[in-house]
């Protein structure tokens, strides 16, 4: 059986966390995080075989962060080229009632994430920036959104409606997600 490599991303407003896995053995090959994207004191840390390596350089945006991350994967011999990556998974804060489980990212999914940004304004912009940067870097690789709100989607309605006016649920989508 051939090993395939999958990248997992957790984009933040000024950060990008990532890990590369080899499948099917579920082995983590490298993980890291980039902090203070857009600031002059931007830095990133990689963890390879238990050793932490820190770098510093200004990165203007999430696209530069993704480009830097991909270069680090190649420089550290975790991939020979980006063609080895077979899929990308993104942690997304809020899928509302649209997504009870993980989905392949397409234009409609992006539209829904943008729409739900009003509920998680600190997280979705960075998560969307990560998706868009990966689309540019790995345009032919499938991307999957994994929503925090999927976890309790199977709760009965009487368990996820808050004790607030029902109109808030109907009008604003206010409900318990876990």
Task: Write out the residue ranges for each language-model feature.
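Glycine-rich phosphate-binding loop plus the immediately following alpha-helix
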Residues: 164-178
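Residue-level signal for inorganic ion chemistry
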Residues: 10, 34, 88, 148
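General beta-strand structural signal in soluble alpha/beta enzymes
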Residues: 90, 121-124, 142-147, 178
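Short glycine-rich, Thr/Ser-proximal phosphate-binding strand/loop in the N-terminal lobe
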Residues: 6, 15-59
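Conserved active-site "lid/cap" helical segment
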Residues: 40-86, 130
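Rossmann-like NAD(P)H-binding beta-loop-alpha module
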Residues: 135-139, 145-153, 159
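Short beta-strand-loop/turn "lid" adjacent to the catalytic site in phosphate-handling enzymes
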Residues: 76-123, 151-161
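Short glycine-aspartate micro-motif
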Residues: 6-8, 85-89, 144
């Amino acid at each position: 059986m051939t090993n395939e490599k999958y990248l997992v991303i957790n984009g933040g407003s000024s950060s990008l966390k990532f890990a590369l896995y080899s499948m099917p053995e579920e082995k983590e090959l490298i993980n890291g995080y980039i902090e203070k994207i857009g600031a002059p004191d931007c830095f990133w840390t990689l963890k390879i075989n238990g050793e932490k390596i820190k770098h510093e350089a200004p990165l203007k945006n999430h696209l530069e962060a993704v480009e830097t991350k991909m270069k680090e994967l190649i420089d550290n011999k975790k991939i020979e080229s980006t063609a080895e990556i077979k899929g990308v998974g993104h942690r997304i804060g809020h899928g509302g009632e649209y997504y009870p489980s993980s989905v392949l990212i397409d234009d409609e999914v992006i539209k829904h994430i943008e729409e739900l940004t009003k509920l998680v304004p600190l997280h979705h912009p960075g998560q969307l920036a990560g998706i868009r940067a990966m689309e540019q870097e790995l345009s032919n690789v499938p991307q999957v959104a994994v929503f925090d709100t999927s976890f309790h989607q199977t709760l009965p309605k009487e368990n996820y409606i808050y004790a607030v006016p029902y109109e808030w649920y109907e009008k604003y989508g206010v409900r318990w997600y876990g």
